[in-house]
From Swiss-Prot:
Family: Belongs to the cytochrome P450 family.
Function: Hydroxylase that catalyzes the C3 regiospecific hydroxylation on the 5-methyl-1-naphthoate to 3-hydroxy-5-methyl-1-naphthoate in the biosynthesis of the antitumor antibiotic azinomycin B.
Name listed for the protein in its UniProt record: 5-methyl-1-naphthoate 3-hydroxylase
GO MF term (any one): oxidoreductase activity, acting on paired donors, with incorporation or reduction of molecular oxygen
Coiled-coil parts of chain: none
Binding site for heme: C347
UniProt KW keywords: Antibiotic biosynthesis, Heme, Iron, Metal-binding, Monooxygenase, NADP, Oxidoreductase
EC number in record: 1.14.13.189
Reactions listed under catalytic activity: 5-methyl-1-naphthoate + NADPH + O2 + H(+) = 3-hydroxy-5-methyl-1-naphthoate + NADP(+) + H2O
pH effect summary: Optimum pH is 9.0.
Organism lineage string: Bacteria, Bacillati, Actinomycetota, Actinomycetes, Kitasatosporales
Pathway: Antibiotic biosynthesis
Cofactor: heme
Length: 401
């Protein structure tokens, strides 16, 4: 570790700020580990925030929504003028109603019906890379795959699919930098309004068309509520998936022995996907606000406190996952990670995400072995999403499929 990185680590362990320039993918794991080893901690950032980082503490907070409320927004600090996102920025009973309206495209039955199409997408996107023997598995595969799945599952137009990634990237940039929603929300709002108008004018039977036609107490859902639901689908539906798949294929590219094992033992593939999610959480943290004074591991957190939940640190807690920094698909409890959340805000897209991972691993196991062609650089997007700049790989020639 460089002197600069060491200084940043020392500073941020006691004054944690996920938007500090010193909090990078290279320093974050060490910072999160040291914070976890200290137990419940407090930082003066943003007027004072509390940090929970042990697995048991984070899971308990996710379970107890009455004490740890989402109703003041889970993204923090919030950009001025930023809308509330559905359903993650709501508590029951409103949260329950929103989830019910959002559930249709992500039920087990709906996802099962999509599986053949998922497999066709994966095969079609990977074929050109394998055919020429090399390519970028992030830009040429993970990103377009995640966006195409989103479009098919929810009924987004080709035009919207082409623009959604840039709109999301712009949003994350300004949330963390200027914290001014006027820099990103009007354009995002216009994109969503265009989609809603399209399906209202020409209903096509898609989930989006059904959502736009929904009524509550005899009246149509307000447009702003629709946009809040759709933006949550658009962002979570492709951003987290893209980053998770990128991490998964990057892991495989560095481990040909694991690739071979997945060919011999296809039953191991789900465990590999879950272990990748545990080891590299796609969304590093969310926040809550306490509704009452609460004692955690002997530390009193006052009512009205902003609490940061460090998912990465919890997923690497040795009390829950022995030797946590080692990628080990045989550990047996990888699926108990918190990368999909827990409790009332448990990820609604979990069935779809797991079906996507299965399709990816199945198709890659039919292709030649592949190796990382050049190093990949990591960066934070909005201080929460750890992303690669690329995953450049080369497929081996003459390898057994």
């Amino acid at each position: 570790m460089t002197t600069e990185a060491a200084d940043a680590t020392d500073r941020l362990v006691t004054a944690f700020d996920h938007h500090d320039p010193g909090y990078t993918p290279r320093t974050a794991e060490r910072i999160n580990t040291e914070i976890r080893e200290r137990g419940v901690t407090w930082s003066p950032a943003y007027g004072g925030i509390w940090i929970l980082s042990r697995y048991a503490d984070v899971r308990a907070a996710l379970t107890d929504w009455r004490t740890y409320s989402s109703a003041r927004g889970v993204h923090f600090p919030r950009a001025e003028g930023m809308p509330m996102f559905s359903p993650i920025d709501y508590d029951p009973p409103a949260q329950r109603g929103i989830r019910e309206r959002m559930a249709a495209p992500m039920t087990g039955d709906a996802v099962s019906a999509m599986v053949p199409e998922l497999r066709r997408m994966v095969a079609r996107l990977l074929a050109p890379l394998a055919g020429r023997g090399h390519g970028d598995l992030m830009a040429e595969f993970a990103e377009p795959f995640a966006i195409e799945v989103l479009g098919v599952a929810f009924g987004l137009s080709e035009s919207c699919r082409a623009r959604i990634r840039e709109a999301t990237r712009t949003m994350w940039t300004y949330i963390s930098a200027d914290r001014d929603a006027s820099k990103f929300w009007p354009a995002f709002h216009a994109l969503l309004a265009e989609e809603v108008e399209r399906v209202r004018d020409e209903p096509d039977g898609s989930y989006l068309a059904r959502l736009a036609a929904m009524r509550r107490d005899g009246s149509p859902l307000p447009d702003e509520e629709l946009y809040s639901i759709i933006v949550s689908f658009c962002v979570a539906g492709h951003d987290n998936t893209m980053n998770s798949i990128t991490r998964l294929v990057h892991t495989l590219a560095q481990d040909p022995a694991l690739q071979l094992r997945l060919r011999r033992e296809p039953e191991l593939r789900p465990a590999v996907a879950e272990e990748a999610l545990r080891r590299w959480c796609p969304t590093d943290r969310f926040t809550r606000v306490t509704t009452r004074e609460v004692t955690v591991a002997g530390t009193v957190i006052p009512a009205g406190a902003r609490v940061v939940l460090l998912f990465d640190a919890a997923n690497r807690d040795p009390e829950k996952f022995p030797d946590p920094d080692t990628f080990d698909p045989d550990r047996g409890n990888s699926h108990q990670h918190l990368s999909f959340g827990h409790g009332i805000h448990h990820c609604m897209g979990v069935h779809l995400a797991r079906a996507e991972f299965a399709a990816v691993l199945d198709e890659l196991s039919r292709l030649p072995l592949f190796d990382l062609e050049q190093p990949s650089d990591l960066h934070f997007e909005n201080g929460r999403h750890i992303m690669f700049d690329r995953v450049s790989v080369r497929f081996r020639t003459g390898e057994e499929h």
